[in-house]
């Protein structure tokens, strides 16, 4: 009797660098590649149509590539725990292969399937290929705790064994002794469904800006490397107006779905760098996107509450406001700030926005203007963002909301000045907010300041055709910086650790921060004026922080100050220690250090609260 094998695709939707699939094929007489799709999940999950379309395109491309190997993809409807016992019997399966899933939900799911496989006498093959490293080994090297500073993470991986090279692509030669039983009704039973079959209305759906699949991913990788080689520049690209638009060399969604191997990307970058730089050793910063992704995966792998504030041992318990109306305006691009609204419109239409655009809208929602929980923003990104990844998405939102990892709350992105400096002419605004197309560049970022004659000439009256600003940014940012200052002063006293950020060495604050882990967080100055705040650090010193607060919006009387009526609820924390447990749960790990309460961090970790200073290589 022959050996029948199944490879279960989840992420890792590719044939190149797929060690689990190669191992599955070795010694097998038949192999079936399956993807399990829950139709109920499609209709009830918080995943938008662009992400579903990208996934289905990935599956279609995978099926097309398998056809070239005289094989097919089997898309099976149902739940894994229900599907596999049936498949094990029906197909007489001897071995099952999977790519290791490091996320808590995935580990729990896979443990259940391994148990079912064991009961059925099925061998389970697991290989790591969605991350560069074995995350458990990083944690073991750190004494059993995940590193919570990027510098500590870099130190640990520098002690790891060199990375293994990507395995060879699955070819007809690899498959020659292995067949796939395919019958005439395959498409009917196991074909990739359409969006319509999953219950989506596709009327008026524009064509995909980011086509899914391994074929597209590898084409983009070559373009990406060709561009780098042509300019011989491995530094972080400067942001400009063109950076805001989707790039044909962008890679982040393909890494997210595993259409592109992170190891292949890593070694291709290494080879190109050595070729251009004449064999000099590449700096860690060359791999910035990949290493930040790895950092967040490591932080999340043993923390099932990583995407929650409550019960999350590394998250500061900040008393955010609940304001559904304000949240909806932000999510739907109706804040009255063209820069914010254009970004959210692009996100909803295309499924992608530039990493610094992510910084801007995340800051606006949380600590900058609306004081709404990062959890709410994370859910919107999970729905709309093609490259939204459970670990990276949650970690990045905690980061930029100053809930974990770094605490530079005195930096505030101005919803007017940031965009104006990036795209002075306002072409990005006109592209995504055509209602403002008629405004001259002088007023396109703050159209409420335009004289009535300008608004009439633009055929757009603010408050009628386009909303007035929902908050006064100058007042909101001042209040929220004060709120954060009080929280961290109290937390610092409670833990006895120096948790407050120190003054950046660069007076503009550039070089620290980051959202989505894909690029250095150029901390952008605000709208113009700057104020100072004296912040007490955990060691008893007082430093003057440069707080970029922005211009007040003249001519905007009557703007609702939504989400700020509870300011006093946080200010009282500075006056007594009986409220401290609200900030960081007692008995948990100290924020940003991985050190238990009462112990002093080592000097390396103690200095990391200012956030990592590392040049990050963007792939977007």
From Swiss-Prot:
Motif range (LIR 8): 379-384
Motif (LIR 3): 151-156
Motif (LIR 7): 335-339
Residue ranges of the motif LIR 2: 82-87
Gene Ontology biological-process entries: circadian regulation of gene expression; circadian rhythm; entrainment of circadian clock by photoperiod; negative regulation of DNA-templated transcription; negative regulation of gluconeogenesis; response to light stimulus
Pfam family, one: DNA_photolyase
Short motif (LIR 11): ranges: 430-435
Keywords, sorted A to Z: Biological rhythms, Chromophore, Cytoplasm, DNA-binding, FAD, Flavoprotein, Nucleotide-binding, Nucleus, Photoreceptor protein, Receptor, Repressor, Sensory transduction, Transcription, Transcription regulation
GO cellular component terms, A-Z: cytosol; nucleus; photoreceptor disc membrane; photoreceptor outer segment membrane
Recorded coiled-coil stretches: none
Short motif (LIR 10): ranges: 411-416
UniProt short sequence motif LIR 12, positions renumbered to this chain: 486-491
Motif (LIR 1): 50-54
Subunit structure: Component of the circadian core oscillator, which includes the CRY proteins, CLOCK or NPAS2, BMAL1 or BMAL2, CSNK1E, and the PER proteins.
Protein family (similarity comment): Belongs to the DNA photolyase class-1 family.
Name of the protein described by the UniProt record: Cryptochrome-1
Organism this protein belongs to: Erithacus rubecula (European robin)
Primary gene name: CRY1
């Amino acid at each position: 009797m022959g050996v029948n094998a199944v490879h279960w695709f989840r992420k890792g939707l590719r044939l190149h660098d797929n060690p689990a699939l190669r191992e599955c094929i070795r010694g097998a007489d038949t192999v079936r590649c399956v993807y399990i799709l829950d139709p109920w999940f499609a209709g009830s999950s918080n995943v938008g149509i662009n992400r579903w379309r990208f996934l289905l395109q990935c599956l279609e491309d995978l099926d097309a590539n398998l056809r070239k190997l005289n094989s097919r993809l089997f898309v099976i409807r149902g739940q894994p725990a229900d599907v596999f016992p049936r498949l094990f019997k029906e197909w007489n399966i001897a071995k099952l292969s999977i790519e290791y899933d490091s996320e808590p939900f995935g580990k729990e799911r896979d443990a259940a399937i391994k148990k079912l496989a064991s009961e059925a006498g099925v061998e389970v093959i697991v290989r790591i290929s969605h991350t560069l490293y074995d995350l458990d080994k990083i944690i073991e090297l750190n004494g059993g705790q995940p590193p919570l500073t990027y510098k500590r993470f870099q130190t640990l991986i520098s002690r790891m064994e060199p990375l293994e090279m990507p395995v060879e692509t699955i070819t007809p030669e690899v498959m020659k002794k292995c067949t796939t039983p395919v019958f005439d009704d395959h498409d009917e039973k196991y074909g990739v469904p359409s969006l319509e079959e999953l219950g989506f209305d596709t009327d008026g759906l524009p064509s995909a800006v980011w086509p899914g699949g391994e074929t597209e991913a590898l084409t983009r990788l070559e373009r990406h490397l060709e561009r780098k080689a042509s300019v011989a520049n491995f530094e972080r690209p400067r942001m400009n107006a063109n950076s805001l638009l989707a790039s044909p060399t962008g890679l982040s969604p393909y890494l997210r779905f595993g259409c592109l191997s992170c190891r292949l990307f890593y070694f291709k970058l290494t080879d190109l760098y050595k070729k251009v730089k004449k064999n000099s050793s590449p700096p860690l910063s060359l791999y910035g996107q990949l290493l930040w992704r790895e950092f967040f995966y490591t932080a999340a792998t043993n923390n099932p509450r990583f995407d929650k504030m409550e019960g999350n041992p590394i998250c500061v318990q900040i008393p955010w406001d609940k304001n559904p109306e304000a949240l909806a305006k932000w999510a739907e691009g109706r804040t009255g700030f063209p820069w914010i609204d254009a970004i959210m419109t692009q996100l909803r239409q295309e499924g992608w926005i530039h990493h610094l655009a992510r910084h801007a809208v995340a800051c606006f929602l949380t600590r900058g203007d609306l004081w709404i929980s990062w959890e709410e923003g994370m859910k919107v990104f999970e729905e709309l963002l093609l490259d939204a990844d459970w670990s990276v998405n949650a970690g990045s939102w905690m980061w930029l909301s100053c809930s974990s990892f770094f605490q530079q709350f005195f930096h505030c992105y101005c919803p007017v000045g940031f965009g104006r400096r990036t795209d002075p002419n306002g072409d990005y605004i006109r592209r995504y907010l055509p209602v403002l197309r008629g405004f001259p560049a002088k007023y396109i970022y703050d159209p409420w300041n335009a004289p009535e004659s300008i608004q009439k000439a633009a055929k757009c009256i603010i408050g009628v055709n386009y909303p007035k600003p929902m908050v006064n940014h100058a007042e909101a940012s001042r209040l929220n910086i004060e709120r954060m200052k009080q929280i961290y002063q109290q937390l610092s006293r409670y833990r006895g650790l120096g948790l407050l950020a120190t003054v950046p060495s660069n007076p503009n604050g550039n070089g620290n921060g980051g959202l989505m882990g894909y690029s250095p967080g150029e901390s952008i100055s605000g709208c113009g004026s700057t104020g100072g705040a004296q912040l007490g650090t955990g060691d008893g010193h007082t430093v003057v922080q440069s707080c970029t607060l922005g211009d007040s919006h003249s001519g905007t009387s009557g703007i609702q100050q939504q989400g700020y009526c509870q300011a006093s609820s946080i200010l009282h924390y500075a006056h007594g220690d009986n409220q401290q447990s609200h900030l960081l749960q007692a008995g948990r790990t100290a924020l940003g250090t991985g050190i238990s309460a009462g112990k002093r961090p080592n000097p390396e970790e103690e200095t990391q609260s200012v956030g990592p200073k590392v040049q990050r290589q963007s792939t977007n």
